[in-house]
Each structure stands twice: as structure tokens, then as C-alpha cells.
């Protein structure tokens, strides 16, 4: 080890010690981390409209807090973004204006006027009706009609006949389905219908209600639809205006009270506690703290979060993980990351929970070798009912089909758990899919984060985790990351050229370190330096607005940044210690504990 290496390790040791201490201070008594999502003006406006329509008296205190949040977060240009203090968007601005105009037309008259002027700058009513400019066109247009700011000309109907699809097809519909069912019921009640349409409405109403009833049973007394305040608001509005199922409406109202944030707002979905705990636990294991009782407690919490029942709404088998409790929907990303965390605790597929999680991933693998988020995709792309709401079914921003990040997490989990040894045909199929979707320059897109850095770094990490660090796809990923590193040493193309983010820098570094690049080379050294230097006074990192949710809404998540950055620095330190060599053949990573099938859980 050179003097330079020793100096580098000393700095990394200090930074990792400070960061792990800071994260342990945030750990909850049950062993998990909160995984806080940022407050969303758009989601807050949606929830406010729902409470105003369903129970304005009983929800008065929540409504007042939400209105105060919107009033104090309006931008200087009159608009609202997808998050506080971010660039105004048509979705965020129009939703906020609609809520204020519907609930407080006099008290907020000046703010409404400024907000509508910003909507006009986006293109006004014409832009709202244009699904290419307003991804939430149906929601936004309808709310502005309710508020008296737009006419109902061109208002789109949400087709309740989606409820009549055969079960195998209906299971392919993604997590916008509850909104589609509730708004389909609303449209059936409110919009004019001829004889044929009326017959369809009558036939589709019972299965649509049955679908929502079933989800309430899954979500439990403390859950909301899709564990999302925004989705729950849409269901609440649809059923309220349809005059149906006041019990389900009350269920939603209870959920709003449970999920309001301290600032008086709501996020697009419930806090990502499973993501956070998976990411941070893996990071602690990379650091070498796997035997720490606090990390062991986190692993026990992850185990307890595994779903033991079929999820009939997507066709997913038992054994998966969702993003939150009690009822986040089982998905490939959370399941892959949970398997990785448990494997890092010294358990391979001889462990029943690891085996079930890994088998869940194999059962969900698509025909082409990829993975999607919720449902297995056949040769026809997964249908998302949001296409029926916005009219752009083929848009890659709407379809929740195969995703490079989801696929990478699944591949890493299958390799690190021992479920799929090198050369396994399931891994070969995944590799072929990565090769197919990789751009000629080496970059790889993904569904759930903006930009290409997240996809490229994640795929590189996964390939290295299963012994394919020297493959052509991996080499092209490295080349792309080399060419796209920003002048400040970080990575980031999601927010614009040259704008480095913690998440993208960490994902790039994870891929490079897993692939065994020379740690003395400027590229990884500068990346690690960027991460160390961009911690805050609390020794943690500030998240960026690059997570993609329903219909192009964006969010930021604190522990995606913290967890990935922790992993990246720890893996870089390991790279420095071993000199950057990699055999290119699969071997159990050095940060994982020795497999012990008899280990007490």
C-alpha cells in the first residue's frame, strides 16, 4: 500500500465513521429508518380537494394546514413545482391553483391570480388539455372545471370498462388502477351516457367496486390505496362524487390524517421505509458493521416486512417486499434490495426467506430477461391505466415496463444470494436484455430515475456482482461513465448537463467499484472525493429531485441519497484496500458475512 493509499484510507475511515454515526442516530427503535419523501404541492392539492369534497367540516384542521403550506410555498414566479423550492411545473401549479380556487377563492384570490398567470405562461387551458404538455391532464382539467377556471370541453372519460378485462389482463395493470376504477365509477355517474355506454357502466360497476374493496382488505385499517396519499385522494374524490361506498371514503380520510407531514403537507407516496432500511443496511455491511447489533436489528425488520401472501392485483406470488408498511405493493426493486441485505448478513438460498425472495424474482422475470416493477410483462407491453387518462399509451414515461435499475437489482440479488450461479440461463437472458437496451455510446436508460447515469451505474454494478465485469456491456458502461463524469468529479445528467447529484454520483461509483477499476485512477478518486466533500454539517447528503413517480411526477428521498452514497464510499474503500483488482469471476463479496444456514435469525 502506498503512502497515497494510506492517506486516502484515513480520510475515508473518518468520513465513514461520521456518516454511520449520523445514520445510527436516525434509526428508529424497531431497527428501521424512516425514508422520508419530500412534501409535494401537487399531492397536497389533491388531498385538499378530496377532503373538501368528502368532509370539509371533519377535516377542517387538516385543510387549514394544507392551505397554509400551499400559500407559503408559492414561487416568486407564481408557480409551484413538484417539490418545495424547485422549478415550477404545469402539474404542480395547476393542481395548487385548483385547490385554492375551490377551497379558498376569496382568501387566496391574489395567489390564485398569480398562479393562473403562471399556468397561462405554460400555455393555459390549451396546455392543460394537451397530454404531451400536462401529464396529469385528466386530473388537472377536472379539478379546474370544479373550481370554475376551465370549461368541460374536451374533458376525457376514464373508462370503467377496464374492470371488465379478464383477470390475467387486469393483473397486468399497474398501480394507477385504483384511480382508474374510482374515476371510472365517477365518470359513469356524472357524464352523459347513451344506451350502449349505460349498459357498459352497469356491467362494470360491480367489479370496479369489488376491486377497490379487495384492496382495502389488503391495505388494512391503517393503509391507504397503494400506500399513497395522492392515489388515496383520487379514490376518495371518485367515490365521493359517484355517491358510492362512504366507508371506503372514510378509510381514505383516516389515511390522510395519518400521513400528513409536520409542515402540513403530503408526499406523492408514503415514506419509503423499506427502501431506506435496505439501502442503509447494505451500506453498513459494506462498511464492515454487519455484526453490529443495530444492523442485525435492521435485518430482522427487513425480514419481518416480507409479504407472505399472493398479491392478486398484479399476479405477484408471496415472498416479495413493498416499499412501506403495512401495505406497499410487492415489487422487484424492494425485493431485490431486501434479498441483498439479508444475504449480506450471511444467508444464502438455504435460508427460507432468501430462497422465497429470490424465487419471487425469478417468477417475475419478463420473457425477454428483464424485470419490471410490479407485474411480469409478456410480449405485449404492460398496460397502465394512466394511458386511458392521458392518451399516450406508448410513452416510455407512462408505461411501467422493463426497467434497467429494477433488472439490475434483481440480477445482483440472484447472484449474491447464490440462487443463480455464473452462467445460469436466467442471468444470461438478463445480460442479453442489457445488451439490447444499451445505447451505442454505452449509456442505459431506466424508468424510475431521471437520466441515464442511474441505469448505467446500476447495470455495471449488477454485472460485476455476477462475474461479468469484463463483458462487452460492462466495458461500454465504464466507457460511458468515464466520458460523462462532470468537471467537478461527480456525475449527473438528470437535472441538466454538468449538474452532479449525490444519487447519480453514488450509483456511478458503485458500478465502477464493483467492476474493480483502479482506485488510484482519477475517475473513481475524484468521485469519492466529491461524495465526501458534498456532505452537509450533519455528515449526510441532500437528496435531489430525480425520482420518477406516477405520470412524470418527481420526488426526492433522503435515504436513497444517504444509503447509496454510504455504499459507494465503503466499496471504494474496499477497492483501495485490495488494490482495485477483480478476477471477473463471481465470488462472494468481502463485505458479506460467511454463509451460515444455522445462524439464528
List the model feature ranges, each with a label.
Residues 1-601:
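Preference for long, amphipathic alpha-helical scaffolds in soluble/luminal domains
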Amino acid at each position: 500500500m502506498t503512502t497515497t493509499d494510506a492517506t486516502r484510507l484515513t480520510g475515508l475511515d473518518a468520513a465513514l465513521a461520521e456518516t454511520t454515526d449520523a445514520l445510527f442516530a436516525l434509526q428508529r427503535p424497531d431497527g428501521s429508518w424512516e425514508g422520508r419523501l419530500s412534501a409535494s404541492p401537487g399531492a397536497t392539492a389533491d388531498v385538499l380537494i378530496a377532503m373538501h369534497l368528502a368532509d370539509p367540516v371533519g377535516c377542517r384542521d387538516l385543510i387549514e394546514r394544507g392551505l397554509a403550506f400551499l400559500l407559503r410555498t408559492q414561487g416568486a414566479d407564481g408557480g409551484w413545482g413538484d417539490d418545495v423550492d424547485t422549478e415550477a411545473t404545469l402539474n404542480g401549479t395547476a393542481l395548487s391553483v385548483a385547490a385554492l380556487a375551490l377551497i379558498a377563492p376569496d382568501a387566496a384570490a391574489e395567489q390564485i391570480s398569480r398562479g393562473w398567470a403562471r399556468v397561462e405562461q405554460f400555455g393555459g387551458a390549451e396546455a392543460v388539455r394537451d397530454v404531451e404538455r400536462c401529464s396529469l391532464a385528466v386530473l388537472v382539467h377536472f379539478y379546474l372545471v370544479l373550481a370554475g377556471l376551465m370549461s368541460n370541453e374536451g374533458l376525457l372519460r376514464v373508462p370503467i370498462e377496464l374492470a371488465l378485462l379478464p383477470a390475467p389482463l387486469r393483473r397486468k395493470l399497474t398501480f394507477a388502477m385504483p384511480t382508474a376504477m374510482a374515476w371510472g365509477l365517477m365518470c359513469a355517474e356524472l357524464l352523459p351516457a347513451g344506451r350502449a355506454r349505460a349498459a357498459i357502466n352497469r356491467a362494470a360497476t360491480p367489479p370496479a367496486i369489488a376491486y377497490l374493496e379487495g384492496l382495502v382488505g389488503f391495505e388494512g385499517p391503517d393503509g391507504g390505496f397503494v400506500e399513497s396519499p395522492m392515489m388515496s385522494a383520487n379514490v376518495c374524490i371518485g367515490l365521493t362524487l359517484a355517491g358510492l361506498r362512504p366507508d371506503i371514503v372514510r378509510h381514505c380520510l383516516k389515511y390522510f390524517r395519518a400521513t400528513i407531514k409536520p409542515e402540513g403537507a403530503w408526499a406523492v407516496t408514503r415514506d419509503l421505509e423499506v427502501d431506506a432500511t435496505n439501502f442503509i443496511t447494505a451500506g453498513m455491511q459494506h462498511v464492515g458493521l454487519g455484526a453490529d447489533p443495530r444492523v442485525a436489528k435492521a435485518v430482522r425488520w427487513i425480514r419481518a416486512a416480507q409479504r407472505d401472501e399472493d398479491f392478486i392485483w398484479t399476479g405477484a406470488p408471496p415472498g416479495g417486499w413493498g416499499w412501506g408498511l403495512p401495505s406497499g405493493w410487492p415489487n422487484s426493486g424492494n425485493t431485490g434490495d431486501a434479498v441483498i441485505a439479508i444475504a449480506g448478513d450471511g444467508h444464502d438460498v438455504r435460508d427460507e426467506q432468501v430462497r422465497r425472495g429470490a424465487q419471487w424474482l425469478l417468477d417475475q422475470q419478463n420473457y425477454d430477461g428483464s424485470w419490471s416493477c410490479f407485474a411480469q410483462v409478456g410480449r405485449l407491453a404492460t398496460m397502465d391505466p394512466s394511458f386511458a387518462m392521458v392518451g399516450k399509451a406508448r410513452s416510455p414515461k407512462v408505461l411501467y415496463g422493463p426497467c434497467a435499475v429494477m433488472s439490475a437489482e434483481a440480477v445482483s440479488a440472484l447472484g449474491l444470494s447464490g440462487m443463480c450461479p455464473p452462467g445460469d440461463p436466467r442471468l444470461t437472458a438478463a445480460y442479453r436484455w442489457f445488451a439490447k437496451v444499451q445505447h451505442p455510446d454505452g449509456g442505459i436508460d431506466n424508468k424510475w430515475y431521471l437520466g441515464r447515469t442511474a441505469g448505467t451505474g446500476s447495470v455495471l454494478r449488477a454485472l460485476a456482482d455476477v462475474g461479468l465485469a469484463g463483458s462487452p456491456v460492462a466495458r461500454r458502461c465504464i466507457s460511458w461513465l468515464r466520458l460523462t463524469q462532470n468537471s467537478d468529479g461527480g456525475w449527473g445528467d438528470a437535472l441538466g448537463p454538468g449538474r452532479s447529484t449525490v444519487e447519480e454520483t453514488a450509483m456511478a461509483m458503485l458500478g465502477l467499484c464493483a467492476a474493480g477499476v483502479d482506485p488510484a485512477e482519477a475517475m473513481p478518486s475524484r468521485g469519492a472525493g466529491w461524495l465526501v466533500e458534498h456532505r452537509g454539517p450533519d455528515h449526510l447528503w441532500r437528496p435531489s429531485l430525480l425520482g420518477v413517480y406516477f405520470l412524470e411526477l418527481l420526488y426526492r428521498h433522503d435515504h436513497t441519497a444517504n444509503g447509496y452514497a454510504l455504499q459507494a464510499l465503503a466499496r471504494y474503500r474496499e477497492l483501495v484496500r485490495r488494490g482495485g483488482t477483480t478476477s471477473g469471476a463471481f465470488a462472494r463479496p468481502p463485505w458479506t458475512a460467511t454463509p451460515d444456514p444455522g445462524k439464528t435469525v
